[in-house]
Amino acid sequence: MAAPSLVLFRRDLRVADHPALAAAMAAGPTIGVYVLDDTADGRPLGGAARWWLHHALTRLAADLESLGVPLILRRGAQNTVVPALARDVEASGVYWSRRYTPWGVAADKGLKAWASEAGITAQSYAGSYLVEPWAVQTKQGRPFKVFTPFYKAMQAAGEPSLPLPEPEPQEPLLLTVKSDTLADWALLPTQPDWASGLRQTWQFSAGERTADFLDTAVNA
């Protein structure tokens, strides 16, 4: 079997319209990775964010499994966890969607530097916005502060790329490396269980409400 690639998931917990996942699976066997770094941006996740993360990762794991892609969960600092995992699975490359916060950019630059030294591929992709933040700027090369000029500049930039479909499934990978479980992370509230009503209004319900809004409010 060819050496696998790692795809790092952060906030982009989906399989459709995911350029990094599509590129990795086109290159060969692929392993999904999510690293829970509690203080990466200087503060721990709040209760609602932890609840969302639990259910988003549950859905992501199921969606990846349908594509033959395992999802490995690890806790710790990204730039410590990922190199160790890459060595364990003898990865040939690491793929991810770009981040734009100062700490995210710095961490990902460090990851690319490690990959270069290790002699493996490191590829980042635009997977979060319609356009990169620096692609639409004022004539002075600065971010817009007023909506109307920004809107006109976006219109002049042309149509954005169409969303990518889900990749074609690969042959399922059987791994022996260790993965945390969501139960290990204890992300869900217990006492009080304030999230009980949210469990009935997850992605499917959101899709129904969006379709209803488009039919009644937009197309009316």
Predicted segments, located by residue:
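Glycine/tryptophan-enriched, flexible segments
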Residues: 142-220
